From Swiss-Prot:
One of its GO terms (molecular function) is structural constituent of ribosome. Residues 249-274 are annotated as: Disordered. This is Large ribosomal subunit protein bL28m. One of its GO terms (cellular component) is mitochondrial large ribosomal subunit. Residues 262-274 have a biased composition (Basic and acidic residues). The keyword Phosphoprotein does not apply. It is found in: Mitochondrion. Component of the mitochondrial ribosome (mitoribosome), a dedicated translation machinery responsible for the synthesis of mitochondrial genome-encoded proteins, including at least some of the essential transmembrane subunits of the mitochondrial respiratory chain. The mitoribosomes are attached to the mitochondrial inner membrane and translation products are cotranslationally integrated into the membrane. It comes from Neurospora crassa (strain ATCC 24698 / 74-OR23-1A / CBS 708.71 / DSM 1257 / FGSC 987). The keyword Glycoprotein does not apply.
Length: 274
């Protein structure tokens, strides 16, 4: 009869094995849940009353199937003038400014032994409010750039900075966000008021194909005249003035060497007072 009974030791061994297996499975599930790998980056919200969504970090502008758009509708983001960053590639997917990984040494005070170390930028993942888009934009941003955004008055003002240093700080991702907010009616109206203040005519559809160099040259001429207090001249007035100078140079003959002769001419001897 004793051969048919199960020993208590075997029962304890079986129970211990089951508990260990269950605990291991739970730990594996927790490790999978705590993984740092992100499947989707920057899931941006939809922009209200607009068919153009916020672009992805990869540079593509997704158009959902439910969005009614024409067949010939094509979105092309202008290429970033400074190209992708070759150092610290992570900065291509966020607003990092000019931040890089800094390398240095830890020096012992007792025996001056040096050990290599590095300082990484303080990168945060934030939801920044865009006034022109009317939504929160998800992006990685450093604390130094956050300070600059607060100083200039918001995300839109930071992205619309026109100086070369600001454009370099934006990086490829900031350049795409800059392009997106420039498509909003609020920013277009703002640019139209700036053109009117500079004395430039309102922008027409045929002016869309004008090269960037011509537009910058036109703004530069009007801006210099506006800074000097003169009345800014329109494009037609500048063209008429150029034609008039060309015709004048063809009809009149300029005397060469007259100024040099006057420069070398001796002054008459002063007369003595009686």
């Amino acid at each position: 009869m004793s051969s048919f009974l199960v020993r208590p030791f075997c029962l304890r061994a079986t129970t211990t094995t089951t508990t260990t297996t269950t605990t291991t499975a739970l730990v594996q599930q927790q490790l999978r849940a705590l993984t740092t790998t992100t499947a989707l980056t920057y899931h941006q919200p939809r922009v209200p009353s607009s068919a153009i969504p916020i672009p992805n970090v990869s540079g593509r502008v997704p158009l959902p199937d439910s969005t009614p758009v024409p067949e010939d509708f094509k979105i092309e983001i202008p290429s970033y003038p400074y190209g992708p960053r070759r150092v610290y590639h992570q900065s291509n997917t966020g607003l990092y400014g000019s931040a890089l990984i800094r390398f240095g040494n830890n020096v012992s005070k007792r025996n001056e032994i040096k050990t290599r170390r590095k300082w990484r930028p303080n990168v945060q993942q934030k939801r920044l409010w865009s006034k022109s888009l009317g939504v929160f934009v998800r992006t990685r941003v450093t604390t130094r750039v956050l300070r600059t955004i607060d100083k200039v008055g918001g995300l839109d003002e930071y992205l619309l900075g026109h100086k070369a240093a600001r454009v370099k700080e934006l990086g490829p991702w900031g350049w795409m966000l800059r392009w997106r907010i420039m498509q909003t009616p609020e920013i277009r109206e703002r640019f139209a008021k700036e053109r009117e203040a500079l004395g430039l005519p309102p922008r027409r559809e045929e002016d869309e194909e004008k090269s960037l160099e011509e537009q910058l040259r036109e703004f530069q001429v009007a801006g210099i005249q506006f800074a000097e207090g003169k009345a800014p001249k329109t494009k037609g007035q500048l063209k008429e003035e150029a034609d008039r100078l060309i015709k004048k140079s063809e009809t009149e003959e300029f005397g060469l060497g007259q100024e040099e002769d006057l420069f070398m001419k001796e002054e008459p001897k002063p007369t003595k007072m009686a």
